[in-house]
């Protein structure tokens, strides 16, 4: 039974109704049959109803985006006060404590946007700092309430939180009519740390994290257990880690007992950080190359280098459907070259972090690359993102990371 509260109402078509009933939280402007008589203020709440007027959910309105409403609740009796949001944060943190190993809680994703019913809000923890990206206008308006609650809930569980840093230098904010910026969020009555750098430990490997200038929030936490899987297989092998970024896979391979590891990246800054991380971990079985992988792999094949384990973890080659075809050509090229470079019996770890490069497309690409390289793929493992980046069924956008381990024969 619906409560007495009153929000503006959007009536949607059958297509949107089916999507919402199936679990997706987004309402696109093109799927709205009837708009409120008076358009609500940007970032405020509205109800969504079916073509027959049945309540479907309540969400934040975005007047600048093609996604007009992002649901936060499907309970018509919810009251969206501070207590509601505190419960949401507590629920998200309790989930992380359940699915992650205790040692991993100091560097983890605390909130994963829609998968935790905080649309457009990723929050990462790096020791005593929370780093956020506010990618929807609803979450932007909620910050004065929500961000202090994030610190309060974790502190109440005995966690040390000294500050919240905002990485809102993200182009997606423009689609919500939001400006780009970065800096400390001012928690009421508190000062923030002077430094925007910290150190984390993951799988026993230490990393320097620059959460002011690093990519995204400063470090990619979603591959933590995939890196561990690579370390387990790397012992005794000669490893090439392409797109190494700050060296995470390479460092895990080296610490896992690889005979030699070469870490390659096109960015000189990334290579410098990877070298710094190697030194911090006392790893001497590593070399570093600042080179484009698309040029590196053909060169190494021509020169006959003896790598028997290759890791491909590129950045997203596509962030839109219209560029998927070109992206798949890029994925095929690097995988084909890696398969050609590897000796028979060598190992390949290959990944894609693009939601639009679906698992079906990725598998099709791998089969094609193997055929052209005259190789067969013996599957060892198929993996996804770590569970602190949960996949919410009904929301395919949360299922983005593909990770395969093969023996190439």
Located regions from the model:
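Non-catalytic substrate-recognition/targeting regions of SAM-dependent transferases
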Residues: 111-124, 143-219
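Conserved SAM-binding loop of SAM-dependent methyltransferases across substrates and taxa
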Residues: 246-259
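Non-catalytic accessory regions of SAM-dependent methyltransferases
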Residues: 1-127
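Conserved SAM-binding motif I beta-strand of class I
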Residues: 260-265
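Mobile active-site "lid"/loop adjacent to the S-adenosyl-L-methionine
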Residues: 307-337
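C-terminal catalytic and target-recognition region of SAM-dependent MTase-like enzymes
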Residues: 333, 347-409
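Conserved class I S-adenosyl-L-methionine
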Residues: 236-245
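S-adenosyl-L-methionine
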Residues: 269-311
């Amino acid at each position: 039974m619906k409560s007495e509260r009153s929000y503006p109402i959007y009536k949607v078509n059958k297509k949107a109704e089916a999507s919402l009933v199936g679990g997706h939280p987004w309402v696109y402007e093109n799927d709205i049959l009837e708009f409120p008589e008076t358009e609500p203020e940007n970032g405020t709440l509205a109800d969504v109803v079916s073509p027959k007027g049945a309540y479907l959910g309540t969400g934040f309105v975005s007047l600048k985006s093609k996604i007009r409403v992002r649901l936060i609740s499907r309970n018509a009796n919810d009251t969206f006060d501070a207590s509601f949001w505190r419960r949401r944060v507590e629920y998200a943190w309790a989930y992380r404590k359940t699915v992650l190993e205790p040692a991993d809680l100091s560097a983890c994703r605390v909130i994963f946007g829609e998968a935790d019913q905080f649309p457009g809000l990723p929050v990462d923890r790096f020791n005593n700092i929370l780093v956020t990206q506010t990618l929807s206008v609803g979450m932007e308006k909620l910050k004065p309430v929500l961000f202090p609650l994030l610190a309060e809930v974790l502190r109440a569980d005995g966690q040390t939180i000294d500050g919240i840093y905002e990485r809102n230098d993200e182009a997606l904010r423009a689609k919500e009519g939001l400006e780009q910026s970065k800096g400390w969020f001012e928690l009421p009555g508190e000062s923030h740390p002077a430094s925007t750098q910290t150190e984390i430990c993951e799988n026993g490997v230490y990393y320097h994290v620059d959460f002011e200038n690093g990519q995204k929030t400063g470090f990619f936490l979603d591959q933590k257990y995939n890196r561990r899987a690579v370390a387990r297989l790397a012992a005794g092998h000669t490893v090439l880690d392409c797109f190494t970024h700050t060296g995470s896979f390479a460092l895990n391979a080296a610490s896992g007992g690889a005979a030699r590891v070469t870490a390659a990246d096109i960015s000189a800054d990334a290579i410098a950080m990877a070298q710094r991380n190697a030194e911090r971990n006392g790893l001497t079985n590593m070399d570093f190359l600042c080179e484009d992988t698309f040029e590196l792999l053909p060169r190494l094949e021509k020169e006959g280098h003896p790598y028997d384990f290759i890791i491909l973890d590129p950045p997203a080659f596509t962030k839109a459907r219209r560029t998927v075809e070109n992206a798949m050509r890029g994925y095929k090229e690097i995988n084909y070259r890696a398969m050609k470079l590897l000796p028979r019996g060598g190992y390949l770890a290959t990944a894609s972090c693009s939601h639009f490069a679906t698992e079906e497309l990725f598998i099709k690409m791998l089969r094609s690359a193997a055929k052209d390289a005259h190789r067969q793929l013996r599957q060892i493992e198929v993996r996804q993102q770590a569970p602190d980046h949960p996949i919410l069924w009904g929301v395919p956008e949360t299922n983005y990371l593909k990770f395969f381990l093969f023996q190439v024969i």
